[in-house]
C-alpha cells in the first residue's frame, strides 16, 4: 500500500539549486523521484541527471522518469556515500548536488518493510533489502548497554535505559519479530504520562533503530565531503534533513566551508591564509510553510540548507 509522493520543500530546492539547461545535477537520494523530476525538467536535452539510491524499488521509478524527461540520465544503485565517492574518483563534476536525507515516503508506506510504528509488519527497516543487518537482529541480539546508547544517541530518547531494559526482558521470553510487538514493549517501558506527550511513544526509538540499521549518520559524514568535492566552482549544494542529528552535521559542514580567516581577532594581519570556499544561500535553515505542512504533515520537521561553492578548495 502506498500514498501519492509529495516532495518536501520542492519549490525551495529549485530556487536554491537553480538547475539550468545543460547542467549536471546529482540527486543523491532519489527515493520516489519527486525532486529529481522537477530538476530534470529544467536541464534540457544537453543536461544530465545522475540519480542515486540503494533501494532496488527506486530503480523502477527512475526508469519511468528517464523515459519521460528530455535530459540525459544515469542511475547508480548504491548508498549515496559510496556512489558520491566513486563519482569523485572517476572525475565527474556537477553543477548541483541534492541530498534529501532519511527515509523516503515510499519506504514508510510499504508497510511490510517495517519502518512504521503505525502498522504491524516484520521488524526489518533496511533501506537496502540485500544487506544482512536488520531491525530484528538489532532488537534481539544487541546487549542492553548498546541498545540504550543507540536509543539515547540516535533517537535522543529520554527513556533509553528503561526501553533497552524492557526489550532485553521481553526477548528473554520470546524473540521480538514484529513492529507491533516492539511498540508494545516501548509503551510499557515509558511512564504513563509520557506516552501521550510529544507524538507517538515509539517514534524516537524507531528512528534510532532505523538509523543504526542503515548506518545513516556514518553515510552522511562520508557523503558531505564527497558531495562538495564533486561540485564545480559555482556549483550548488542543498541538503534536506528531518531531525537534529542530520541537520547539525549539514549546518557544521557548510558553516566550516563558509568560514574565512580563523586568526585570533587581535592579530593585525591574517597569518592563516584561509579564505571561504562557500557562500551560504540562506542565513538560517529553510522550513516548510504552514500551507505545505497542512498539505503534507510529514514535511513539518524538514530543514533545508544550501551553499554555493566559491572555489575548488578540496573536500577537507
Q: Language-model segments: which ranges?
A:
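S-adenosyl-L-methionine-dependent methyltransferase catalytic core, i.e., the SAM/SAH-binding region
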Residues: 1-316
